[in-house]
């Protein structure tokens, strides 16, 4: 809303040219009124038509005066604007770069410096901030390209009376003409202890933190030498240039959110951090080239509407010439990373001391506190709570690396569940399986010297009995039977020695009554002769498979 001006106000010479049209109009109207009064004196009895014309002229004069002096009375006619020019405009731009929201005392100083009323200074700053928010909202993005920001700095002297503006983010505390973006563009390998990520917003439910400004290049050396996350170190890096920073600690494997705010003229640093091990799911969404084209088209349409609303042809041409510079490159693609966590994060706060006499390093530590988000949404955003993820928006390249870093950590540090190491026999090539009956030099204690003899492996008597029965029905030569008997005797010697050294002669007599299959039959079916684990700590003195057929009864069988 523009200020109501009176004609007898003594303006500064910088704005005299802006009011020439008002003074000229005033002189013409006064001359016309004087002529009408003179004609009225010459004609004492005017005709009714002339009186009607005089009243109409007087009403028209009153309407013109009201339309030109009261800008708050909105009507079909667009009100004229008062613009700052020359040195006054340069001063306003410099002050806006330093502080876009000056206080009443600061606006008064600016007013005295340029000879402009304080209300006009306040309106100029309001219109400049409103124009920035309008272009941010029109682009449907969280950032403003640097070239577009330079255009904003050039045309903010044009006033705006649009009351339908929607604010989507706070205004940056410091604006940089060379690079007005929200991206810090810190190399990922710039620090040996921390990874810095280009994040422009953090959202958890309806709680949202938008980034303003960017880290200054003169602080890159401090970033490179950062060794701890003390409040003073973090504040020195942010240095009133940005109010949001996200990093991951390599040593502690923690994700850290840092942001700042002002309350009662005191700067407050906030910190939210949680371990990577609490992240149970990552969901990365990347912006496509079609999204960039649509964003550029929206930006061009917004610039076109702004140019149509402006009554300055020179500035309109300037915006049209620079519209092609508003296109974002593919390297500036945006991304969105959603993190689902299994526990609540930790919250900390630090109040910066403004006392000049006190050393700030005396209390250089974070104070653990409760959740300071709206409705404690961040504290409850975990699996089993509200199940709401942490949504991070930022530079696509940076989010890609962050997603890969979390996944690599999870894959290398997660404790896998206990897996049964037993290998199915079908999966093992049969040529690599040595038949246990033929290895006369092997022992159950060879693979593990500490194995107790009582816990040594033994044969499955059911399988062996079946094999013996099948062998009795088959035909074999006497030489084959004798060779099989000799091999089995060697195996029995080892088995008997591992079972409390029983009498080998008795075992040979029992075995002589059995007819075993030859070696070829055993190798052909190795799966029928697998060993089984013991089920009892006390083994019988004489295994069943060593007994003759008559002794294999229920009275003699052991369980």
From Swiss-Prot:
Compositionally biased region (Basic and acidic residues): 324-333
Gene Ontology cellular component terms for the protein in this record: cytosol; nucleus
Keyword Magnesium attached: no
Location of the protein in the cell: Nucleus
Main location: nucleus
Gene3D superfamilies cross-referenced by the UniProt entry: Homeodomain-like (1.10.10.60)
InterPro entries the record matches: HD (IPR001356), Homeobox_CS (IPR017970), Homeobox_DNA-bind_prot (IPR051000), Homeodomain-like_sf (IPR009057)
Residues modified as Phosphothreonine: 542
GO biological process: one example: positive regulation of transcription by RNA polymerase II
Low complexity bias: start-end ranges: 24-52, 63-74, 293-307
Keywords, in A-Z order: DNA-binding, Homeobox, Nucleus, Phosphoprotein, Transcription, Transcription regulation
Biased composition (Polar residues): 141-151
Record region (Disordered): 16-88, 132-158, 293-333, 534-559
Record field: compositional bias (Acidic residues): 308-323
Signal peptide: none
GO molecular function: DNA-binding transcription activator activity, RNA polymerase II-specific; RNA polymerase II cis-regulatory region sequence-specific DNA binding; sequence-specific DNA binding
DNA-binding region extent: 77-136
SUPFAM superfamilies per the UniProt record, alphabetical: beta-sandwich domain of Sec23/24, Homeodomain-like
Superkingdom in the source lineage: Eukaryota
Function according to Swiss-Prot or TrEMBL: Regulator in phosphate metabolism and acts as a derepressor of another central regulator PHO5. Binds to the upstream activator sequence (UAS) of PHO5. It also binds to the TRP4, HIS4, and CYC1 promoters.
Miscellaneous: Present with 6420 molecules/cell in log phase SD medium.
Name of the molecule in the record: Regulatory protein PHO2
Protein's organism: Saccharomyces cerevisiae (strain ATCC 204508 / S288c)
Lineage per the UniProt record: Eukaryota, Fungi, Dikarya, Ascomycota, Saccharomycotina
């Amino acid at each position: 809303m523009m200020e109501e001006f009176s004609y007898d106000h003594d303006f500064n010479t910088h704005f005299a040219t802006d009011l020439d049209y008002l003074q000229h109009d005033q002189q013409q109207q006064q001359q016309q009124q004087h002529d009408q009064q003179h004609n009225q004196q010459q004609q004492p009895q005017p005709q009714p038509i002339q009186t009607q014309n005089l009243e109409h002229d007087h009403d028209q004069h009153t309407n013109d005066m009201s339309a030109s002096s009261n800008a708050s009375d909105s009507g079909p006619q667009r009100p004229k604007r008062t613009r700052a020019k020359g040195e006054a405009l340069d001063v306003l731009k410099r002050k806006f770069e330093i502080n876009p929201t000056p206080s009443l005392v600061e606006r008064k100083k600016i007013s005295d410096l340029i000879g402009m009323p304080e209300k006009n200074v306040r309106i100029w700053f309001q219109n400049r901030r409103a124009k920035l928010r309008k272009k941010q909202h029109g682009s449907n993005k969280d950032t403003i390209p640097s070239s577009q920001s330079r255009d904003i700095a050039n045309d903010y002297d044009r006033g705006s009376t649009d009351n339908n503006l929607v604010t989507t983010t706070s205004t940056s505390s410091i604006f940089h003409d060379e690079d007005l973006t929200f991206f810090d563009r810190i190399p990922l390998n710039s620090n040996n202890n921390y990874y810095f990520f280009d994040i422009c917003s953090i959202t958890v439910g309806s709680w949202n933190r938008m980034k303003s400004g960017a880290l200054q290049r003169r602080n890159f050396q401090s970033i490179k030498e950062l060794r701890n996350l003390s409040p003073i170190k973090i504040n020195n890096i942010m240095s009133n240039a940005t109010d949001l920073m996200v990093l991951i600690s390599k040593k502690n494997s923690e994700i850290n959110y840092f942001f700042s705010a002002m309350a009662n003229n005191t700067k407050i640093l906030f910190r939210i951090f949680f371990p990577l091990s609490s992240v149970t799911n990552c969901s990365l969404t990347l912006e496509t080239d079609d999204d960039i084209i649509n964003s550029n088209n929206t930006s061009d349409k917004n610039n076109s509407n702004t140019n149509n609303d402006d009554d300055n042809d020179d500035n309109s041409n300037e915006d049209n010439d620079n519209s092609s510079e508003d296109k974002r490159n593919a390297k500036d693609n945006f991304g969105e990373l959603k993190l689902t966590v299994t526990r609540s994060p930790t919250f900390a706060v630090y109040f910066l001391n403004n006392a000049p006499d006190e050393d700030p390093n005396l209390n250089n530590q974070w104070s653990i506190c409760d959740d300071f988000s709206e409705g404690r949404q961040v504290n409850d955003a975990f699996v089993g709570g509200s199940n709401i993820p942490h949504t991070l928006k930022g530079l696509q390249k940076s989010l890609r690396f962050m997603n890969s870093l979390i996944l690599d950590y999870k894959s290398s540090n997660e404790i896998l569940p206990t897996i049964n190491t037993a290998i199915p026999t079908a999966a093992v090539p049969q040529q690599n399986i040595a038949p246990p009956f033929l290895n006369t030099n092997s022992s159950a204690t060879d693979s593990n010297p500490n194995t107790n003899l009582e816990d040594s492996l033994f044969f499955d008597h059911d399988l062996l009995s079946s094999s013996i029965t099948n062998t009795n029905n088959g035909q074999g030569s006497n030489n084959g039977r004798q060779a099989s008997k000799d091999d089995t005797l060697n195996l029995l010697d080892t088995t008997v020695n591992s079972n409390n050294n029983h009498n080998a002669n008795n075992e040979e007599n029992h075995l002589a009554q059995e007819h075993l299959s030859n070696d070829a039959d055993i190798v052909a079916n190795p799966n029928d002769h697998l060993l089984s684990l013991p089920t009892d700590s006390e083994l019988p003195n004489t295994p069943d498979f060593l007994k003759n057929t008559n002794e294999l009864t229920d009275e003699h069988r052991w369980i």
